[in-house]
Amino acid sequence: MLVRMLGECHVSTGGNGRTDNLLAEWLTRSARMVRKYPVLGSIDTEDMRTLLYSSWKELVILYMAQNNFSFEVHPAANQNIVCPHIDKPRKRRTIARMESHVPSTTHVDQLKFIIGKLEQMNIDSKEFALLRLLMLLNTDLRDLKNSNAVVKASEQIHMLLMEYETVCYPSNPLRLSHMLLHLPGVRGFPIMAFEQLFYRHLVGNTTVKSVLKELLET
């Protein structure tokens, strides 16, 4: 089995010099979300941390789409990773682990597709803010102390989004449904591959989670 991996790589946005600042700013904004919105006030502090650590990638992707972020990935050295002499079930599991941690050309194409679809919808700033809150409030997480509070907050955000669509886009009753259809793709993009692509050169030997911990304490 042969898998095309990018290995060590860096992101380029045409040499405009603003890429790192944007990525850092979006991560900082994501951390500040937990204190910004009153609807989140009923959620346990530890649960808010858990939610942020699991969803920061989704929040940044939505910032990318909102700001028409374009990028190219330039691998330092393309690598063909081969797993010979492994039985097929083990080989599939090994490849799956590789693909979730190491960026591949498939990952890059997948992310560009997701961002492109969101951009095509011409989502406004209010919608993006509410979508980020929905992504933050992941009701499927199992290690929450008070999942009911998260569910209630998520339902409130969903209602606010529905009301907003009714008032601002009355002629497009399917707009909300179309937006929500794109969220599983945002959620499903591998977080380790995303961190490797966009943040490894910024955080160095630490992790994005560690950076978020520091941001929450400041």
Segments from the language model and where they lie:
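Nuclear receptor C-terminal ligand-binding domain
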Residues: 1-218
